[in-house]
């Protein structure tokens, strides 16, 4: 929690291409690239074009980033490479896996804008922009007086349309010379230059705190640009783009048709010059189809001259010794387009023709027949082209008529009037700078390069087109199909793919860009969606070179967020223009406010180190852009104020266009407007059309609203709530999460004119939570008594008879809009002000500043003060007081440091059944579910899901807001315990005392902040008490190690038998009932939730498979010792019980637990400092003889080494007994024979054996339970005989005891047994040798079919594996491929030949390795089934009642042994194999890491169904699963 630097983590995943994902970051952030699960362990290199500090950015120059591994260990799951972001723009990254590109994307870093003499930062969310049409500013020396209107209206950014020389059309966006300042700005006696502009821009920045940006137009130039005539190659002309010739021919024909219509030549045919109705439209369609198209014969440009082709074909057929180039048989005869687009200029591939049409002999008749077939095919191909062009012509007519309808008939169109040469029927698509001559002679020009190069295509836009496709390039038929909405004043520019393709154009536009970037701090990319991306990239790179913090804005009309993101990410667009005018009602306008910025009110505090999430582009939300229709016409003049207020309350940049605030009642045309803007004059009268001031339009209100917008952005009011009060009233709240102040703007929109539409007099009451400090602004749109609007000839004047009446910073009781305000309470700590309105007429706004009530404000301040110990984020708004609860004066970390790991188990974990033993339970959230744990982890698992998504509507948050139940549960549960646990509870209770005093909507956020602070501190406390392996380990290791805290605890009733009173440092406690001292040793739960409490908590086998990973590797040596000794006390018949049942209810029905116990003693001795001392520790024997009644602790103590010897002796002697209380009372499924337990050691082989076909004494212990399927009482996997892992474990034990006995540490060198009445000694040396000599001979299935050691060659179905058992009662079971041999490989690797072992491991990898676990049976086995369903009871013998528990489902714990075996033997195979194996291990383990992170139990399951599908019958977190994965990481 303690980070203050903002760090974002980007996880890299294999083949993940994120080019359409927007990642936005700020300068000063650190970006870390980390490997996702699919890349763990692989050799990955990250490249980026983000430059080294101090270097200039070069888009093409990539560098690799160095990996940093915080743990400096082989387990590098935490490794990362990083960028410290100090430069704005768009930067690319990609990564290679080996030498192959595996994924990549872009990051966009925001610019930092600075203004004022002191160069202070202007945050992007504070931007208030106003657009000016540059040509309406008049002579340059008058600009300041006109621009002052923006300053006085509170704007801090001015956007100028282009300042360059305009083309003939006088459109602001049709530039004749990109390098020259518009001469209109100069006086006859004074020529102004770019330097003058630069000085003004600098003055505005320094003195007015106003930033200036301007447009860059890269797509087109004015048709009369001098330079385009000198460099026609810069345009799409008929020389460099001959594919446009047919379109040009059509365009000329339509122009001539238009001229004839204008001259009345078609009046007789039903087309007058003034097009007025559908009849005229139909006549146009008829003339084009019947008259124009047939004459043009456009299809001829796409056809073959058939006679010519046939003659060529005939010549080739009759040629002597002609060579036919072999052609692809799949190629068919098609027309090859003539690249010069001449009529009948197309051809076909004669090679294909010659192999398609083959004469049957060389005679003239055969050749003639062939030519006829060829002729017929040519006619067919030409017909296909005719049909295609006809299809294009249909579209062309439809588009043309649509255009005519819009321009001349549509109500919303410009109604151009009669067809004239100035206003033709349709806009021309091409320039024609020559005198008009006869049409056929004009057409001949297209083939004369010196003429054709000046026939250039105009620019425009295509509705619904793919913006990433250039519509003027070959392959596009836009010009022919008349789909272009054309700008007849501009020529489209043709850049090609790189500067070398058109050097003059690239150099000219680069110079234009550099002039712009020299004088302006930002640019607006005009027509961005049609600008070739590579061109815009190149130009913006040049601009950023001069202006590193370039502010780039653009408007995109792609219609797709994904496509928008392509432009934003590639170009590094800072803000996308969004239009409020797109909203059709107030509800939609409010939705846009919520969409374009801010987070919900009461949001969770996000950590400084967190994943990098995809973003939506930062918005520049405009109430109107210069392209929009006039809102006064579209809506009403009364809506200007409320809509502006709504837009300004958005948590993003906001903007407007000059004329809106003055209420100009028409659109100010970028083409035809030639009047000048009004000037600022504080004294001007409303009747003065050339000057404005605060009395004009909504300027006074705009000033107040702009200042408020900037204040909210600067002071961190980043949370937003939008309330649709009724169909016209929208209330927008901006909230500061640090000082908990809100600003609430209530706007009554007027989308319909109040004079002509009905608005209700009744306005709903509003409830505003908190205390209203002031009315920031109240404003009403009113009429005043002045002359109505008349359009002025010289100035762009607004509506004089409508203005606003405003009052700022007044008290609530002074308001004229609020009738009365009452105070109500909602619950004990929620103050609400009920507002009743009386004058909130359409076109009015009222803005309140609201604080928490003083009581809640203090409570929040105190909470923030105590939370600063966890994060500096809470410093702002914190309040220190002296009278807080004394416990809060203790830093939480020092309180936590007193806790033991057993106490942390109670605070953090404990599932339902554990908690029930204490009379409690897990917290249940109504209408959702119960938490997984009663401790803090239960809450944190849910919060970790909902915090990053800010899911405040989750039932968890609803429960917190509805009442204090969960809050009290958390603290009371701990206070009811004793010692430091209760102290932690009291600390939480003291924090919750203040939490309960704040408004309910803030409770989820602060509850989370308190808990995450406490929780992370408690985790640190846990790790500090563990081994250095954990403390210095990766996040994965640390999170796995918490399994030790999760599964090891002390219940109300002790689970372990009582240890010898002679043993030192055993933990004790006072019994709550008897008040007597009792032992309270930690026991290890086998798994949660099923094996967690009562007699089913502790199992010998599970405990000792898990003990090394859960307790020894984590450094919990005393707990490990106590568990080893407690189980030692229960030894009986030479066996350790499986079900422990406190020793009294123990069942001695498993053959393997004793060997796992011995393995753990060996591990303890090797891993723990002075570990061998355990051998002398006293063991309190519960059953000194096999038939003793259970003795109280301390009655008979023995050193551990004697107990070990007894176990070895009993096995060599042979074990045979019947379980006590045999029958349904201890096992309702077992058949009678199953209760007979046998075990022993084979005299020949030294192998431990045991069991019968009615019991299952190994870990694969499923007993049939179904009467219906007739498998009740039959074990699914008896594994009788010598199970491979038991042989391996016994070999490990014997070898170890032999080593100790040689050093006289273990006092016994042999075991003594009675055979035929005689005492026989078997030395450990001999026993060890027997196993060594026989293991591979009898367990390995040779690849040689004639191997004499193979007793049942007919049962072999996989060679090169190790058997699962030897000597089973059903011999075929020996030959099943299961993962158990890998256990033997780890504990007794000396039994295996490296090459054979490696082969077997490769087979296991191919057949058994699953995503999380190992298949428990070969999928090729006939009884394999990978899905375990214990509830299913059917007739299927192999499945019913979960009979296939170990016949396929993927168990997790064996995967640890498989991976450890792979690691061990790979090191013997050589460095190359080792490297590959490490990659495999890391890759497999990464899936466990992902599961662990995502699991609400924060554990690894017992098993999964096949392919890692969830198994509902599995424990959610299992001790041995966690343990063996930790052991693998330890081995790594």
Swiss-Prot record:
Major localization class: cytoplasm
An example Gene Ontology molecular-function term: amylo-alpha-1,6-glucosidase activity
Transferase is among the record's keywords: yes
Location relative to the cell: Cytoplasm
Tissue: Liver, kidney and lymphoblastoid cells express predominantly isoform 1; whereas muscle and heart express not only isoform 1, but also muscle-specific isoform mRNAs (isoforms 2, 3 and 4). Isoforms 5 and 6 are present in both liver and muscle.
Family label: Belongs to the glycogen debranching enzyme family.
Purpose: Multifunctional enzyme acting as 1,4-alpha-D-glucan:1,4-alpha-D-glucan 4-alpha-D-glycosyltransferase and amylo-1,6-glucosidase in glycogen degradation.
Name of this chain's protein: Glycogen debranching enzyme
Organism listed in the record: Homo sapiens (Human)
């Amino acid at each position: 929690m303690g980070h203050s630097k903002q760090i974002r983590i980007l996880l890299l995943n294999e083949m993940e291409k994120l080019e359409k994902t927007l990642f936005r970051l700020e300068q000063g952030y650190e970006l870390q690239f980390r490997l996702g699960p699919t890349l763990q362990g692989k050799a990955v290199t990250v490249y980026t074009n983000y430059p080294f500090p101090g270097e200039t950015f070069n888009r093409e120059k990539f560098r690799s980033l160095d990996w940093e591994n915080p743990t400096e260990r082989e387990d590098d799951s935490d490794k990362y490479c990083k960028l410290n972001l100090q430069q704005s723009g768009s930067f690319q990254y990609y990564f290679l896996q080996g030498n192959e590109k595996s994924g990549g994307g872009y990051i966009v870093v925001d610019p930092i804008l600075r203004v004022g003499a002191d160069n202070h930062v202007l945050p992007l969310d504070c931007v208030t922009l106003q657009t000016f049409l540059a040509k309406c500013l008049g002579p340059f020396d008058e600009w300041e007086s006109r621009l002052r209107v923006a300053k006085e209206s509170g704007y801090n950014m001015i956007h100028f349309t282009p300042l360059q020389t305009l083309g003939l059309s006088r459109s602001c966006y049709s530039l004749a010379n990109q390098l020259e300042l518009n001469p209109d700005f100069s006086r006859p006696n004074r020529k102004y230059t770019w330097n003058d502009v630069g000085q003004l821009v600098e003055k505005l920045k320094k003195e007015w705190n106003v930033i200036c940006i301007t447009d860059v137009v890269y797509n087109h130039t004015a048709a009369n640009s001098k330079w385009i005539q000198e460099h026609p190659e810069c345009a799409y002309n008929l020389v460099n783009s001959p594919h446009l010739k047919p379109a040009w021919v059509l365009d000329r024909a339509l122009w001539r048709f238009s001229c004839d219509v204008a001259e009345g030549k078609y009046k007789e045919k039903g087309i007058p010059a003034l097009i007025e109705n559908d009849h005229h439209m139909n006549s146009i369609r008829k003339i084009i189809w019947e008259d124009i198209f047939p004459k043009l014969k456009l299809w001829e440009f796409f056809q073959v001259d058939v006679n010519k082709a046939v003659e060529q074909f005939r010549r080739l057929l009759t040629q002597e010794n002609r060579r036919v180039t072999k052609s692809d048989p799949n190629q068919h005869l098609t027309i090859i387009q003539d690249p010069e687009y001449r009529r009948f200029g197309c051809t076909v591939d004669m090679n294909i023709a010659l192999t398609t049409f083959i004469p049957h002999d060389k005679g003239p008749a055969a050749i003639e027949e062939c030519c006829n077939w060829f002729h017929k095919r040519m006619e067919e191909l030409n017909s296909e082209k005719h049909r295609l062009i006809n299809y294009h012509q249909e579209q062309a007519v439809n588009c043309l008529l649509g255009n005519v309808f819009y321009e001349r008939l549509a109500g919303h169109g410009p109604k151009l009037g009669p067809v004239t040469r100035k206003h033709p029927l349709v806009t021309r698509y091409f320039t024609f700078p020559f005198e008009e001559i006869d049409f056929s002679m004009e057409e001949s020009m297209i083939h004369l390069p010196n003429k054709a190069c000046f026939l250039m295509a105009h620019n425009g836009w295509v509705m619904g087109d793919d913006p990433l496709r250039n519509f003027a390039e070959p392959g596009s038929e836009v010009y022919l199909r008349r789909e272009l909405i054309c700008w007849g004043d501009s020529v489209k520019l043709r850049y090609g793919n790189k500067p070398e393709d058109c050097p003059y154009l690239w150099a000219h536009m680069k110079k234009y860009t550099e002039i712009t970037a020299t004088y302006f701090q930002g640019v607006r990319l005009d027509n961005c969606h049609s600008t070739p991306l590579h061109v815009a990239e190149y130009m913006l790179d040049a601009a950023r070179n001069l202006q590193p913090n370039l502010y780039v804005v653009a408007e995109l009309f792609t219609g797709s967020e994904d496509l928008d993101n392509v432009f934003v990410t590639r170009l590094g667009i800072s803000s996308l223009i969004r239009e409020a005018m797109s909203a059709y009602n107030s509800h939609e306008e409010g939705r846009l406010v919520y969409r374009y910025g801010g987070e919900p009110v009461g949001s969770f505090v996000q950590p400084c180190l967190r994943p990098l999430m995809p973003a939506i582009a930062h918005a520049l939300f405009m109430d109107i852009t210069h392209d929009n229709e006039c809102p006064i016409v579209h809506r009403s003049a009364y809506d200007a104020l409320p809509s502006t207020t709504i837009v300004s309350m958005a948590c993003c940049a906001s903007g407007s266009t000059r004329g809106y605030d003055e209420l100009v009642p028409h659109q100010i045309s970028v083409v035809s407007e030639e009047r000048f803007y009004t000037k600022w004059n504080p004294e001007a009268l409303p009747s003065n059309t050339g000057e404005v001031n605060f009395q004009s339009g909504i300027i006074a209100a705009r000033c107040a609203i702009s200042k408020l917008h900037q204040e909210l952005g600067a002071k961190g009011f980043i949370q937003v709530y939008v309330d649709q009060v009724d169909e016209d009233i929208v209330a927008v709240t901006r909230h500061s999460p640090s000082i908990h102040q809100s600003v609430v703007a209530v706007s009554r929109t007027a989308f319909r004119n109040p004079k002509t539409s009905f608005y209700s007099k009744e306005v709903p009451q509003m409830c505003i939570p908190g205390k209203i400090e002031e009315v920031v602004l109240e404003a009403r749109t009113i009429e005043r008594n002045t002359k109505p609007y008349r359009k002025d000839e010289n100035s762009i004047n607004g509506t004089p008879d409508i203005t606003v009446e405003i009052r700022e910073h007044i008290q609530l009781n002074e308001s004229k809009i609020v009738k009365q305000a009452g105070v109500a309470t909602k619950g004990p700590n929620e103050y609400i002000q009920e507002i009743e309105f009386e004058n909130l007429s359409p076109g009015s706004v009222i803005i309140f500043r609201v604080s928490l009530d003083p009581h809640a404000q203090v409570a929040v301040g105190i909470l923030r003060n105590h939370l600063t110990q966890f994060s500096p984020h809470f410093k702002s708004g914190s309040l220190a007081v002296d009278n807080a609860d004394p416990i809060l004066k203790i830093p939480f970390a020092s309180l936590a440091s007193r806790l033991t790991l057993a106490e942390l188990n109670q605070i953090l974990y404990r599932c339902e059944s554990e908690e029930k033993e204490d009379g409690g339970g897990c917290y249940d959230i109504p209408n959702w579910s119960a938490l997984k744990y009663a401790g803090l982890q239960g809450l944190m698992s849910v919060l970790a899901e909902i915090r990053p998504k800010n899911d405040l509507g989750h039932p968890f948050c609803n429960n917190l807001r509805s009442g204090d139940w969960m809050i009290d549960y958390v603290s009371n549960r701990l206070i009811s315990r004793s010692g430091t646990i209760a102290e932690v509870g009291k600390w939480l209770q003291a924090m919750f005392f203040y939490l309960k005093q704040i408004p309910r909507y803030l409770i989820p956020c602060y509850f989370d902040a308190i808990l995450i602070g406490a929780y992370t501190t408690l985790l640190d406390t846990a790790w500090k008490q563990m081994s250095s392996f954990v403390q210095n380990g990766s996040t994965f290791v640390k999170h796995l190690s918490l399994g030790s805290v999760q599964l090891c605890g002390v219940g109300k009733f002790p689970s372990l038998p009582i240890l010898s009173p002679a043993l030192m440092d055993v933990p004790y406690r006072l019994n709550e009932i008897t008040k007597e001292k009792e032992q309270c040793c930690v026991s290890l739960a086998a798994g949660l939730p099923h094996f967690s409490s009562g007699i089913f908590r502790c199992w010998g086998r599970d405990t000792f498979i898990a003990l090394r990973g859960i307790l020894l590797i984590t450094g919990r040596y005393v707990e490990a010792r106590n568990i080893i000794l407690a189980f030692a006390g229960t030894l009986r018949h030479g066996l350790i019980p499986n079900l422990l049942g406190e020793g009294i209810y123990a069942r001695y029905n498993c053959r393997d637990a004793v060997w796992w116990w011995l393995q753990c003693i060996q591990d303890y001795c090797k891993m723990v400092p002075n570990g061998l001392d355990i051998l002398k520790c006293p063991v309190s024997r519960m059953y000194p003889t096999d038939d003793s009644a259970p003795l109280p602790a301390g009655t008979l103590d023995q050193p551990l080494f004697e107990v070990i010897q007894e176990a070895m002796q009993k096995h060599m002697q042979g074990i045979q007994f019947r379980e006590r209380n045999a029958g349904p009372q201890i096992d309702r499924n077992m058949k009678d024979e199953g209760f007979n337990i046998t075990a022993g050691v084979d005299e020949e082989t030294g192998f431990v054996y045991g069991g019968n076909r009615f019991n299952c004494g190994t870990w694969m212990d499923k007993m049939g339970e179904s009467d219906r399927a007739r498998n009740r009482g039959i074990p699914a996997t008896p594994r009788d005989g010598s199970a491979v892992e038991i042989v391996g474990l016994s070999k490990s034990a014997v070898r170890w005891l032999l080593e100790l006995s040689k050093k006289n540490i273990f006092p016994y060198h042999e075991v003594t047994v009675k055979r035929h009445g005689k005492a026989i000694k078997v030395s450990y040396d001999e026993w060890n040798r027997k196993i060594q000599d026989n293991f591979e001979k009898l367990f390995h299935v040779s690849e040689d079919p004639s191997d004499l050691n193979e007793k049942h060659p007919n049962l072999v179905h996989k060679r090169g594996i190790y058997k699962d058992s030897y000597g089973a009662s059903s011999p075929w079971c020996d030959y099943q491929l299961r993962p158990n041999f890998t256990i033997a490989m780890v504990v007794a690797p000396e039994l295996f030949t490296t090459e054979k072992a490696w082969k077997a491991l490769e087979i296991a990898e191919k057949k058994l390795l699953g995503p999380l676990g190992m298949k428990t049976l070969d999928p090729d086995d006939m009884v394999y089934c990978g899905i375990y369903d214990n509830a299913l009871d059917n007739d299927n013998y192999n499945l019913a009642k979960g009979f296939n528990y170990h016949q396929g489902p993927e168990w997790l714990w064996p995967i640890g042994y498989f991976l450890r075996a792979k690691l061990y033997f790979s090191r013997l195979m050589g460095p190359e194999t080792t490297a590959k194996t490490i990659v495999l291990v890391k890759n497999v383990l990464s899936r466990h890491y992902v599961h662990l992170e995502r699991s609400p139990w924060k554990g690894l399951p017992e098993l999964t169904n096949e392919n890692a599908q969830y198994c509902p019958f599995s424990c959610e977190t299992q001790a041995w699963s966690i343990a063996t994965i930790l052991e693998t990481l330890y081995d790594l």
